């Protein structure tokens, strides 16, 4: 909740969940950058590339900034169908088999929710020994990434 309050003025969502149908335990603090606030970024299997833009940020930019402070964040878990071992196997989307159509990723057709979460999401430092002051520094670092 502290991250959620501290980042409320940024174009991000913290631990999105259905308040009517679920009750999370919040053991991990995850954040998703709103689509229109995403700076250009590409993630490969072992490396990444991003470009900073005023008013926007990317998960990798934020993770690098947090790391420079000496704290550890990480990307949200990579969906299995994007991992090399499973890359050629079928997967299910809300519209059926994601590998069953040759145009599954053309705008206006298949929606790959897992890939979108992986692209725009990250896990923030979270430890039961983290102080409020340490969390405040992480919140400030994230604000700076959007400037």
Where on the chain are the PLM-derived regions?
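PLP-dependent aminotransferase class I/II
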Residues: 1-147
């Amino acid at each position: 909740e502290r991250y959620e309050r501290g980042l409320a003025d940024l174009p991000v969502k913290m631990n999105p969940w259905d308040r009517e149908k679920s009750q999370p335990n919040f053991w991990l603090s995850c954040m998703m950058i709103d689509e229109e606030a995403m700076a250009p970024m590409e993630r490969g299997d072992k490396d990444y590339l991003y470009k900073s833009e005023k008013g926007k940020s990317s998960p990798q930019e934020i993770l690098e900034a947090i790391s420079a402070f000496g704290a550890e964040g990480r990307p949200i878990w990579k969906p299995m169908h994007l991992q090399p071992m499973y890359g050629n196997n079928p997967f299910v989307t809300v519209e059926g088999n994601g590998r069953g159509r040759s145009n599954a990723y053309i705008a206006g057709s298949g929606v790959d929710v897992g890939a979108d979460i992986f692209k725009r999401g990250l896990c923030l430092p979270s430890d039961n020994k983290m102080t409020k002051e340490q969390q405040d520094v992480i919140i400030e670092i994230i604000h700076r990434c959007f400037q």
